[in-house]
Amino acid sequence: MPENTVEGFRSALAAGAEAVEFDVRLTADGVPVVVHDADVSRTTDGEGLVHELALADIRRLQVRGENAEMQVPTLAEALVAVAEADGGADIEIKNVPGDPAYEADRESVLEATLVELERTGFAGPVVISSFNPDTLQRCHELAPEVPTGLLSIDAVPPSDTLEVAEHDGHAFILPSVRALLGGVGVVAEAHANSVRVGAWNADDPATVRRLLALGVDAVATNDPTMAHAVRTAWLREGGAGERAR
């Protein structure tokens, strides 16, 4: 299933995922939509920057993939679909330096996301995640009850991410798989300090097993059917992994 689509979320949750991860950006007219890239050309049949397109423009786009009927969903549509499947949501806020839509002095994407969470009454488990610590700090100010997760790239040691998370009060650290597997003792240290650990992305059985062996709390994957099967087998064998996502 194509990424960041309602159909993809339903498929992942039906395959055994407990939650889905998706990315949120704002249209030119301020509507939060679920799309990863700043430019729509990779994932749809259109072109242009999300923040320069109105929702009506986004609605005319078709998501690339086997099913040409899929569209870019609004955040509200995504939340309703996830709630109907009794799933959770890891919502990544796209507001980082270097992004064409980056706002250094505002958090419009975050604010719109929090409004939609309240308006839709989404009651499933939720985490607001971002690579931008300032975004997460603003989330604490606006909605202290919402857990936050700090994302980090390959080049950032997970121990550094954990240090920031402990200082800023984040519920999760979310390093890349490569970085986490290269770290020593980070998962145990995080758990000792009441911080949970997820990793992105694990798309083969061996990697999922290695992460489960480390005791991670969540595994982000593009293949939920595979990850769920590996986790099920791991638990059957007496493993200590908690959950695959």
Task: List each language-model region with its residue ranges.
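Phosphate-group recognition and catalysis centered on beta-loop-alpha active-site segments
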Residues: 1-245
